[in-house]
Amino acid sequence: MNFAGFDRQQWFLAHRITAVFQVKQASRKANAEDWRARALARAKQATADLTQQGLLLALGFGERAWLPSADWQMYQQTNTAHLIAISGLHIGLAMGLGFMLVRLLQVFFPTRWIHPPLAQYGGLLMAGLYASLAGFSIPTARALLALSLLLAGQLGRRHYSPLQWLSLVVVGLALADPLIVLSSSFWLSAGAVLGLLLWYRYVPLSLLQFNGKPLWGVWRHLFGLLHLQIGLLIFFTPLQCYFFHGLAANGFVANLLAVPFYSFLLVPLVLFAVLSDGALWSWQVADGLAEFISRLLHLLNGSWLNLSIIQSLLLTAVLALFFGLLLCWIYSAKRMPPLLSVKSKGLSLSSQRSLPVNYRRELQWGITSLIVLCLSIAGWQHSQAANWRLMMFDVGQGLAMGLFKENRGLLFDTGGSWANGSMAQTEILPYLQRQGITIEQVILSHDDNDHAGGINAIFEAFPFAQFISPSYKAYTKVATTQRQLCQQGQRWQWLTADFSVLWPPQAVSRAKNADSCVVLVRLGDFQILLTGDADLSAEAAFSHAVPKLDVLQVGHHGSKTASSEQLIKQAQPKTALISSGRFNPWHFPHQTVLDRLSLHQADIYNSGWSGAVQVDFSDKMTVTLARDPLSPWFSSIIGLSAK
């Protein structure tokens, strides 16, 4: 558990995942397939030779297993991933499609058979059918329940304002599924709807007129789409920055092109192909359309911007200010010149526009409060960055330490890696991006995977950082000119911090535990010792040079092969940081080490229990834990018990 990035505990609980295991061997005992599995199998066979099979199956069944990771990343980085994941948008489209089909069929019915609710029931039935194709995943079930609540209210002749309807739906969903509040997709959906309700309340499409008349026909649809996307740009961007830590510069254009294409062409065609078993070459036509829009989005790819917390807050304040100025411009004068005109004819604002006094007060209070709040938090964040900060990341059974000041940083080890990822990608880089930190130096204690596994990911993100290592081992993303050897006696200064290397005496071809780079860091009056996995023999050689310490990074994850009595007695550390994985097979940290540290009155913090540990240095030293008494309740339960 770290201070930024993906919260696995929250995600597991929101998706009802109570255990994680690895299947080593499996065999099929029976073919107990339901109709969805059979439909998916037929669709897989029918689309086997199509270039966009992964996208078509994702749209038809909510299955992204066959979608290439590069395509999924493209949709994420163009702000259009919501078009692939079957959720409220798709279920709403299915309901609208079912409604229109029933209304069309009612043309052929006798008058006595035509009942207004029949089309609504047809829409709900189509929405339920689409949700079942998606396996009634949590987002689809949530959307279906929300539509059912709205339909029940309409049939019960309940008359509420749009905001009241939204409140009732949110409360109804929370009562039906209390854990829904842990789902980020729920808040994204609710936030998007709330933003659009506010947008249409204060800037309705009816404000626009063409040639002095309300918009109608194709003009109304075209400007309606543009109007919708502008509203989402203003209101949804802050939510996106909060949940995804960035945005796509071309996202507005991408959605402006892709949303109507998916809504009116691709999704209905894929639904028809699934339900008709690919009749009328529907799969082939859908593949051609999917190929076209994918190529179009590919041209817009590459504009993703990672934003820090401060940048996100400032952007939110700017958007709030823009919205306020837009409203002032719209409602400040009774008559204004046309926006787009040719010979006094064109697009203009309605002269009948007005903003009620109560709306005006709501806006003034809301916009001002939001701007002040964003600027205050941004100012506080900026002031905190001026102090030295030491971070022990929670990277499981590995080590990754960071030293930061004024948005500049140094890393000591990078955590482990596996076949298609690393702790650097999932835990370290998200934190650095959210804090707006640039890494200038990377010190590698030794070459074991649990310490060096993320080195290539770090240098891919920060290619100009200096690399300091006790070995000559080459790493793919590290240039030879960036390397500096870590050897006993070296000294250097970075910003106002002084670094002294206590071990090893010489570099080796591949550094192991005993060759760990041991660094003493002086931050004014504070002393920090970073030991990596240095063992007892190494400690015996350098411990005499260790001063009294404020912070000790306990060697080898708390193993009894390190942290000797000689070192602990010499250093007398006030704070001891242990990086270990919970329930690791070696049972680190060892009780002998814990007892030794306690005997010398050190405050002990283990990342396996406390999550990431943050130490701030100002006039005094302050320790903050990612998992503390103020953390959400599930952070203290999920994954913390061996039973």
Question: Which residues are covered by each model-predicted region?
Answer:
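Active-site-proximal loop/helix segments of hydrolase catalytic cores
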Residues: A424-Q425, S445, N449, G453-I458, ...
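Membrane-interface helix/helix-cap signal primarily in integral membrane proteins
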Residues: M1-H82, L347, S422, T426-P430, ...
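Membrane-interfacial alpha-helical segments at the cytosolic side of multi-pass membrane proteins
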Residues: L89-P110, L147-G153, V193-V203, L269-A273, ...
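Conserved beta-strand hairpin/beta-sheet module of binuclear metal-dependent hydrolase folds
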Residues: P268-L271, A385-P430, R434-Q435, K512-G532
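Pre-active-site segment of Zn-dependent metallo-hydrolases
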Residues: R408-D447, A534-K548, S631-K643
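Transmembrane helix-bundle segments that form internal channels/tunnels in multi-pass membrane proteins
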Residues: L104-I114, L118, L194-M391, F404, ...
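Active-site HxH/HxHxD metal-binding segment of metal-dependent hydrolases
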Residues: I443, D447-Q487, P573
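Aromatic-rich juxtamembrane segments at the membrane interface
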Residues: A14-A146, A152, M391, W492, ...
